[in-house]
């Protein structure tokens, strides 16, 4: 670059720094690329699929899927993991349906969880913006986008047409939120529902999410959560097998998948994942229906092996460490211990 151009650029940069603050614009080579911090999800498989050990901090996340697929359960696990690392969390319960007892069973510190049950969509998103701007909240969960009903629709008569009102509300809110959450390093998770496209013909999926296209665009990570099977013991349902696909990922390669057990009343089964990954990595031996680790017989059948690991946390921790070492990601949190390192 010649001297005249350099002087003009320097003058422009100084003017921008003076007007908008130092660091408004930087040359990429002058600044070390910052490491993306993450919040573990409570599932080792999903942490691996996300590529950075969890959901990224300072970003907008969308978790969507059919009803009763495990979306809220997954977000409650993320809240619990964030709290374990000293984070402050807020839950915007637009559906007015949070089960506090269930959240506590999943490890959420409900005594220190901030909760709001807004009356309409504008109020909910205003609350999200205000607490995000404070810089004191590490994680905000909005449950759900479908329940963010615009005030005009609530105050209107039944049958009134409000075409595109919610989509415009979401678009306006996300334009403001994106910069705020990045600057304050706050993660915002929107839970969303699936709807069928009206008049869908030909190619492509007939499914879509509520609230327009803005959330798809502004989200750094989108997780598609689906129930694949019902887990039974003695013909009694005890949980669901859940598959999560990383439909969009701006911080690591997308389209990876993870499967895990979600047990009724307990949430994501850590023991089930230890068995699955232990067998896959040849840490746990599987002979017929029997599972064993070193000299220890874990049990006959997957459910019995899970029960053994639950009753013997020392062996579960040892298998956890072996999986961690085999994967080679030291920062990965498998749920065995709290990570007390370097959190601001």
Curated annotation (Swiss-Prot):
InterPro entries reported for this sequence: AAA+_ATPase (IPR003593), DNA_recomb/repair_RecA (IPR013765), DNA_recomb/repair_RecA_CS (IPR020584), P-loop_NTPase (IPR027417), RecA-like_C (IPR049261), RecA-like_N (IPR049428), RecA_ATP-bd (IPR020588), RecA_C_sf (IPR023400)
Q: What name has this protein been given in UniProt? A: Protein RecA
List keywords of the entry alphabetically.
Answer: ATP-binding, Cytoplasm, DNA damage, DNA recombination, DNA repair, DNA-binding, Nucleotide-binding, SOS response
The record's section on Pfam families has: RecA (PF00154), RecA_C (PF21096)
Recorded hits in NCBIfam families, A to Z, give: tigrfam_recA
Give a short account of what the protein does: Can catalyze the hydrolysis of ATP in the presence of single-stranded DNA, the ATP-dependent uptake of single-stranded DNA by duplex DNA, and the ATP-dependent hybridization of homologous single-stranded DNAs. It interacts with LexA causing its activation and leading to its autocatalytic cleavage.
- Gene name per UniProt: recA
Q: Tell me the Gene3D superfamilies matching this sequence.
A: P-loop containing nucleotide triphosphate hydrolases
State the PANTHER family in the record: MITOCHONDRIAL DNA REPAIR PROTEIN RECA HOMOLOG-RELATED, RECA
Species this protein is from: Campylobacter lari (strain RM2100 / D67 / ATCC BAA-1060)
What compartments host this protein?
Cytoplasm
* Lineage of the organism: Bacteria, Pseudomonadati, Campylobacterota, Epsilonproteobacteria, Campylobacterales
Q: Name one GO biological process term.
A: DNA recombination
Cellular component per GO, a single term: cytosol
- What are the binding positions for ATP in this chain? 65-72
Assign the protein's first listed, main location to one coarse class. cytoplasm
